[in-house]
Amino acid sequence: MSRRASAGQAVERAVAENADVVPDSAKKREVRPILVRGASGLAAIGLLLVAARLPIWRAQFAAPQYPNGLDLSAYGNRVDGDLGEINELSHYIGMPPFNFVGMPEMRLWPLVIVVAIAAAVLAVVTRRRWLRRLACLAVWLIPIGALADVQFRLWQVGHSLDPTSPIRVTPFTPHVVGPTTLMNFTVHAYPGMALVLIAGAAALLTSVPFILKRLSP
């Protein structure tokens, strides 16, 4: 009986010890989602940081008298390119100058980037599905809102024409994306790389749950 009892106790100890041991495969399954979330979050934050220094919107003006064209690049805090010459040409049709100084959007852009980074961190660390979706939506709304804001500003200048200008044209709305033709000028407008990278960050954050689902056994 003593031998049987000791043997039984040995079996019980072995079972207890093995119960505390987590197989390597299980450990890998636990670590993999953390790595995926961390990598996607870092990549998204990197895209957002780069986007903060790139143009939000660009426009190229083409006309026979300008064989090299004219360029306009709108950043979060400034406008570069041939702004002076474009404003001089716009004066002939009574269009007000593109004056971006003092616009609320210009002052808020750094805050927008900070909010986007905070949303990216939240989307990665939260376990609540609704909160993750809300954070991803916040990042998606940034490029959409930026284009909508630029379109509104373009509508403003296109419908604020001076009736006493040397050349009178019908009020018009320049397109925020795509070509706009006025007299002998054709303007090609498109989103800047900043919005492309922000949309890429949003897509990356949104795809994390689907990636984890594919990786799960």
Give the predicted meaning of each segment.
Residues 210-217:
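Membrane-interface capping segments at transmembrane-helix boundaries
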Residues 103-130, 196-205:
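Hydrophobic alpha-helical transmembrane segments
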Residues 32-61:
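N-terminal signal-anchor transmembrane alpha helix
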Residues 1-22, 101:
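Short, intrinsically disordered terminal tails adjacent to the first/last structured region
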Residues 4, 20-22, 115-162, 217:
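Hydrophobic alpha-helical transmembrane segments of integral membrane proteins
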Residues 53-106, 151-189:
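Long, glycine/tryptophan/cysteine-rich extracytoplasmic
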